[in-house]
Amino acid sequence: MATDAKLVKTLREMTGAGILECKKALEETGGNLEEAVELLRKRGIAKAAKKAGRETKEGIIHSYIHAGGRVGVLLELNCETDFVARNEVFKELANEIALQIAAMKPQYVSREDIPREVIEKEGEIAREAAIAEGKPEHIAEKIAEGKLEKFFKEVCLLEQPYIKDDKKTIEDLIKEYIAKLGENIKVSRFCRYEIGE
């Protein structure tokens, strides 16, 4: 099946994947652009998993000041080489993550960064609220687990839905950029400032 060059170009622009990868994905999905994007995303995640163990000693400190100067973000985004750290695509990712932090106010990079006491307290509050509503203990436990998962999605940057596409998380976004740039990428830390907070 001959693949339309315009479709290949569109898919490349949407995913950042190479021409041959785009062409192959379109052929495998019968020319369906949405399915091809999904296929490349899945492959990108597979590529990202292979790179996950590699050290990230280079990177940038990115600053973002929201319009009006009332909200600011400092972000440390790491990669493997200074070549990628200077790349505009890497800087674009840093800006996207900083926008996310400014808008969604995460408190931690990942759930591993949350102190154990905070997790236990949130779980206990959710359990006690369910019991107060008259739920049996085993049901209250399930409700608490569900509320903890929701809590993680609110306070952990990597688990938050991406503000520009809520079908993917920030972790998914980073994996897409890992596939584009061919290096492991990691958010090390961030700080969000807001006037009056």
From Swiss-Prot:
Pfam families linked to this entry: EF_TS (PF00889)
Keyword Protein biosynthesis in record: yes
rRNA-binding listed as a keyword: no
GO molecular function term, any single one: translation elongation factor activity
GO-annotated cellular components: cytoplasm
Superkingdom of source: Bacteria
Entry-linked Gene3D superfamilies: 1.10.286.20, DNA helicase RuvA subunit, C-terminal domain, Elongation factor Ts, dimerisation domain
Chain positions covered by the region annotation Involved in Mg(2+) ion dislocation from EF-Tu: 81-84
Family: Belongs to the EF-Ts family.
Protein task: Associates with the EF-Tu.GDP complex and induces the exchange of GDP to GTP. It remains bound to the aminoacyl-tRNA.EF-Tu.GTP complex up to the GTP hydrolysis stage on the ribosome.
Name of the protein in its database record: Elongation factor Ts
Organism name: Persephonella marina (strain DSM 14350 / EX-H1)
